[in-house]
């Protein structure tokens, strides 16, 4: 028997060494297989990144050409897109040249260096032109902004000049003035055409800029000649007021045109360079696209030139599979050997199990006095465990007997308590029903309070509206009094001027009275002289008497006028005093009305505050009514819960009675166990 075991031990050791060797071969082949595939996967990822960057270079080359053309045309957003495309191209190109640490991408292999060199040459030229366009961004945008403003201003100049021509024709202006005005409209059209040629940026842009400067200068000189006259240019000054106003408006519009001449002349060469750079980019972009495509093809051809490829991986996979098959064969042979040993061991264990079953056969009948024999076989531990279980079962049966007695006593006491709780729950349900009815009555009262508060709020709101209308009436009254005061002041001023005029009339009347007195004296002297002349002066004496009578009548009339003037002055002064008093009363009335307006505003504020408070009371009453309803519902729920509790307590009492019965049945169920002598039986 020992020789057989030693042979089995030697065979097991030899099988283990063979399996270990095969496992080593398997692990090495798997490691090499994964290393090969990892290398291929890494190189494949690198190739994908190279190809992706090369493909993006093709797209970016065309995007740069498109954005450069749009930037040269003056589109502001194109400059940002051009800059982004240029920077993106340079970033991706630097990654292809120097690698990318963030993605562990190495520089491009030497195999694609020829394609890289030709792309580098085209990129250097394209980048230089793109940088030139980006450096001129402000110049290009400013020039296009000026041109856009000119495109709006010059048509306005033409419209204004057409109106000037119409005005001159309607008023019969000289033909040379009309012809000059018409030429100005045509000259403005030519200025706009020159600006558009400058923006084109072709070989004629510099010449167009010079033409723009000359035409703008000529337009300004002719405009000034029409405003002020210019003999050297044979332009006469426009004198029609309406035409002069139009020329002044034209001069204001032309200030921007004349101010833009220098800027356009200075920046037009830069715009030509930008256009030339955009054209260069467009011509190079197609070549760069082709060369970038060749570079992408070069990256795609890298995989075929590597020394380690999929065939090596397949060979390592076959080696690993062969190792697995050999390991399986060795393990099958080892398993058969162990199965034979296990069969022999099972026979010995079967005999020990039968012996143990004979010893514990009485345990199935409830005899807890039996004990199993502990041997050195594997059943020894089982026998020891069975003996321990029998001891624990003895203690359990004893504990069940004691517990059943205690449970029966506790169940009877608990049943009595549950019945008392059921009676208390019924009484509590009756009290809750009464409280719920009282809460419902309180909710009805709160609803009535809420309705009264809502009505009071409506009354307060009407009070606010009335106060607001009263305030508007007071403001209208104040406005009317202010108008009356202004009219009274105007009337007072007119009456004062009437008094001053009457004073002047009085002065004139006094002068006439003095003249009448002097005329009377002169007539008297003439009569004396005529009487002294005798018959020769008789006719003159008659005239002198007539003059004297006229002087006396004039003196009497002037006295009457003087009396009337004094009466007018007196009435005027009284009217002025009355007007001033009326003005004072109007001012006082306006102040009183203003005070009334302030009082009404206070009433309005108080009414609004009162309305808000009443509204708050109404809201609070509604909330209380809602809360009362909620409390009522809660009380109903509590009443229902109490009813359920009462029913549950009654059911609990019945369950506790059943528990007492179950405790008795449990004592009966363990009464069949046989315990050693000296232990209390159930």
UniProtKB/Swiss-Prot annotation:
Main location per the UniProt record: membrane
A Pfam family recorded for this sequence: MCPsignal
One example of a Gene Ontology biological process annotation: signal transduction
Example of a GO cellular component annotation carried by this entry: plasma membrane
Keyword Plastid attributed: no
Membrane spanning residue stretches: 15-38, 307-333
Protein name listed in UniProt: Protein PilJ
Gene: pilJ
